[in-house]
Amino acid sequence: MQTYQKDFIDFVIGCEVLRFGEFTLKSGRQSPYFFNAGLFNTGARLGRLGEFYAQTLTSGGIRADVLYGPAYKGIPLVAATAIALARVSGEEIPYAFNRKEAKDHGEGGTLVGAPLQGEVLIVDDVITAGTSVRESIEIIRGAGARPCGVLIALDREEIGQSGKSAVEEVQDSLGIPVHAIVGFRHLIDYLRGSGRVRELAALEDYRSRYGTA
């Protein structure tokens, strides 16, 4: 685990985006942790999140001509990432996002921001069913550009009904890589390193039942 990944886990625990306990997921599973990206709801938190996205891009050597944020959750995420890249690395990557409803006046259409061209990286919080990613790919290809990957905050690394994780399904069916700031394995490494025995045992048990590895 890289230093920025440990710092990210410290950050999300500190602002209670990541909580440990007993939670019922939409799937009906009982999870020992919950990741609520809706709590990136202040300027300071959003700015810090953008820095972690930017660090993931630069440390992984991930290249893109345009960043794209799917409405609605992806809009502040893609803007924060573009700002952080410009401030931290001096790299100016244009960004765009879509509207849910087409606009029939002004510039019109469903796309806002930079033109979608070349290699386009999708920025989102998590992948649950992959619906948002599939819709984004249709939009990007429809504009004549090429989706080159997806950047998310957390990869849960747990299998669904298909026997694959949501991220694996996206990668296999759509043929594009998914990059995450951290994965479930990093949460386990973090808990092991910080001596949080009870939470560690709960997450290891969860991984033994639902984990991808």
UniProtKB/Swiss-Prot annotation:
Pathway: Pyrimidine metabolism; UMP biosynthesis via de novo pathway; UMP from orotate: step 1/2. Orotate binds at F34, F35, T128, R156. GO terms for biological process: 'de novo' pyrimidine nucleobase biosynthetic process; 'de novo' UMP biosynthetic process; pyrimidine ribonucleoside biosynthetic process. Its EC number is 2.4.2.10. Keywords: Glycosyltransferase, Magnesium, Pyrimidine biosynthesis, Transferase. Its cofactor is Mg(2+). InterPro entries: OPRT (IPR023031), Or_phspho_trans_dom (IPR004467), PRibTrfase_dom (IPR000836), PRTase-like (IPR029057). Gene3D superfamilies: 3.40.50.2020. 5-phospho-alpha-D-ribose 1-diphosphate binds at residues 26, 72-73, 99-100, 103, 105, 124-132. The keyword Mitochondrion does not apply. CDD domains: PRTases_typeI. One of its GO terms (cellular component) is cytoplasm. It catalyses: orotidine 5'-phosphate + diphosphate = orotate + 5-phospho-alpha-D-ribose 1-diphosphate. It is an enzyme of class 2 (transferase). GO terms for molecular function: magnesium ion binding; orotate phosphoribosyltransferase activity. PANTHER family: OROTATE PHOSPHORIBOSYLTRANSFERASE 1-RELATED. Catalyzes the transfer of a ribosyl phosphate group from 5-phosphoribose 1-diphosphate to orotate, leading to the formation of orotidine monophosphate (OMP). Homodimer. Belongs to the purine/pyrimidine phosphoribosyltransferase family. PyrE subfamily. This is Orotate phosphoribosyltransferase. It comes from Methylococcus capsulatus (strain ATCC 33009 / NCIMB 11132 / Bath). The lineage of its organism: Bacteria, Pseudomonadati, Pseudomonadota, Gammaproteobacteria, Methylococcales.
